């Protein structure tokens, strides 16, 4: 019985904490956090190599076609 009461109180407390945190972020205080997240993601993105650029894998090329024998990105041509 005591354990059940403790668990119920803990769940209510955690729910209240989440609700107050959600209200804080909805007032616009999350703006700086979102900018930091965007800056971090932009640093992680990689640039692709244009046609004629060097490559070792197909995903290094903007066209997604890499001639692995010569190590050069090639243009795609569909009939």
From Swiss-Prot:
Residues modified to Pyrrolidone carboxylic acid: 47
GO molecular function: ion channel inhibitor activity; toxin activity
Principal location class: secreted
GO cellular component: extracellular region
Record's subcellular location: Secreted
Tissue-by-tissue expression: Expressed by the venom duct.
Signal peptide from the UniProt entry: 1-22
Disulfide bonds: 48-62, 55-66, 61-73
PROSITE patterns from the UniProt entry: OMEGA_CONOTOXIN
Keyword annotations from UniProtKB, A to Z: Disulfide bond, Knottin, Neurotoxin, Pyrrolidone carboxylic acid, Secreted, Signal, Toxin
Maturation-removed propeptide residues: 23-46
Domain comment in the entry: The presence of a 'disulfide through disulfide knot' structurally defines this protein as a knottin.
Similarity section: Belongs to the conotoxin O1 superfamily.
Protein name (Swiss-Prot/TrEMBL): Conotoxin ArMKLT2-031
Biological source species: Conus arenatus (Sand-dusted cone)
């Amino acid at each position: 019985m005591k354990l059940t009461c403790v668990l119920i109180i803990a769940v209510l407390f955690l729910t209240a904490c989440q609700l107050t945190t959600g209200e804080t972020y909805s007032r616009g205080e999350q703006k700086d956090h979102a900018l930091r997240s965007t800056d971090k993601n932009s640093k992680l993105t990689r640039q692709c190599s244009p046609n004629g650029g060097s490559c070792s894998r197909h995903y290094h090329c903007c066209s997604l076609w890499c001639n692995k024998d010569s190590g050069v990105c090639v243009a795609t041509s569909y009939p």
